[in-house]
Regions:
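Phosphate-binding site recognition
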Residues: 1-259
Length: 259
């Protein structure tokens, strides 16, 4: 608990009691409004509206889908997002990051003024990873200038919008720290949903997977918006997930929605 909220007269006794009651065991109705209240208290103390940063917003959604409590969880999340991002007069702005672009109809239907940036967007493209210039400069500063080609072979390959040669920050920082090549990113991600869809996929999808394993190109139709309720029926959903997760990159867009 933050002393600024519990000491003095910033909060009333009822508000202090509500603040103390925040826990993983609280009721959903209270929990969904808790960030809104925190924004209110911070505004009262600092006199400024609050910026909310929410990382990996889609991770619990994937878990809810895989483990069978999707409807219950999305109902709660919709209430949480409404209270936090829409009916919150103390909010300056918010940034949500995640791997998948969840369909607006799932949890964002009540929100306005959303600016969605994806792997195919040019906006902020160079900020989702390290550029080659940044990586090579770091290698020189760490006395690893002779490892540029090796690092490029291992960690180059991401494309955001029209920007190619984007490097994974986690892999690069780990390499600079340990000075040893390794698949650092592979140990950090959960692929439960992707694995499930691949196992249930049709033969033609598996044939395309074999083509990819031969380092060849494929042409597929995809929609960057993930509609979890339709994953089992949408045979192209796996490509959307693989693209968003960084396993695929766009080489050429023939028309919107074509990879």
């Amino acid at each position: 608990a933050l002393p600024i909220f519990l000491d003095g007269n910033l909060l009333s006794e009822n508000e202090k009691a509500m603040y103390r009651n925040v826990s993983m065991y609280m009721e959903d109705a209270e929990s969904s409004f808790s960030i809104n209240l925190l924004c209110q208290y911070l505004y009262r103390y600092y006199g400024k509206k609050v910026i909310v940063l929410l990382d990996e917003y889609d991770t619990p959604m994937q878990e809810a889908y895989v483990h069978g409590y999707w409807d219950t969880f999305t109902s709660f999340l919709r209430s949480l997002f409404n209270a936090t991002f829409k009916s919150n007069p103390y909010l300056e702005r918010a940034v949500l990051t995640g791997i998948t672009r969840v369909s607006k109809q799932s949890i964002f239907s009540d929100l306005n003024n959303l600016n969605v940036i994806t792997t195919t967007s040019d906006e902020y493209a160079t900020y989702f990873g390290f550029t080659e210039q940044e990586v090579f400069q770091a290698l020189e500063e760490f006395g690893l200038a002779d490892k540029k080609e090796l690092v490029k072979q291992w960690y180059d390959g991401f494309t955001f919008g029209n920007h190619t040669n984007i490097y994974n920050p986690w892999s690069i920082t780990n390499y600079l720290d340990k000075k040893k090549i390794g698949a650092y990113w592979a140990a950090t991600s959960s692929n439960t949903l992707i694995n499930s869809l691949i196992q249930q996929s049709a033969t033609d999808m598996k044939e395309k997977m074999e083509i990819l394993l031969q380092e060849k190109e494929i042409l597929v139709t995809f929609d960057e918006q993930i509609v979890f309720e339709q994953l089992q029926q949408d045979k192209n959903a796996i490509w959307s997930l693989l693209l968003a997760s960084g396993y695929l990159k766009v080489l050429e867009v023939e028309q919107r929605g074509i990879l």
